[in-house]
């Protein structure tokens, strides 16, 4: 479950940097809850090919995060935000995140 949330967060941050096909594979697997077999049938490719394509997308998201670290920075800002007592500043920071 932790990976599911993590990759959804990465997709929110970096999804626009993926190709249309990569977004389609990711969304079918993560958002539409299609199995690799169902995806294989839809795309008229092997189950193994769909498995590989989904993992290529996950690797791409990991690569983008390792270079840009937007998820890491967002998590750090959320931690800082939770310790801020001034509600106005806290709200402004959370709006930026």
Q: Positions of the model-derived regions?
A:
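Short, Lys/Arg-enriched N-terminal segment that forms or immediately precedes the first helix
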Residues: 3-15
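Intrinsically disordered, low-complexity basic tails/linkers immediately adjacent to helix-turn-helix/homeobox/MYB/SANT
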Residues: 69-90
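Hydrophobic positions on the alpha-helical face of helix-turn-helix-like DNA-binding modules
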Residues: 38-40
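C-terminal flanking helix
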Residues: 58-65
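Residues within the DNA-recognition helix of helix-turn-helix
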Residues: 53-56
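Short amphipathic alpha helix immediately N-terminal
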Residues: 20-32
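Key DNA-contact positions within bacterial/archaeal DNA-binding proteins
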Residues: 47-48
């Amino acid at each position: 479950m932790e990976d599911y949330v993590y990759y959804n967060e990465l997709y929110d941050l970096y999804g626009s940097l993926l190709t249309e096909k990569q977004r389609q594979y990711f969304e079918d697997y993560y958002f539409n809850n299609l199995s690799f077999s169902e995806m294989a049938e839809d795309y008229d490719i092997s189950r193994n090919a769909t498995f590989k394509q989904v993992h290529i997308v996950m690797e791409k998201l990991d690569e983008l995060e390792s270079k840009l670290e937007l998820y890491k920075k967002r998590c750090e800002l959320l931690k800082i935000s939770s310790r801020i007592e001034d509600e106005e500043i806290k709200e402004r920071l959370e709006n930026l995140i």
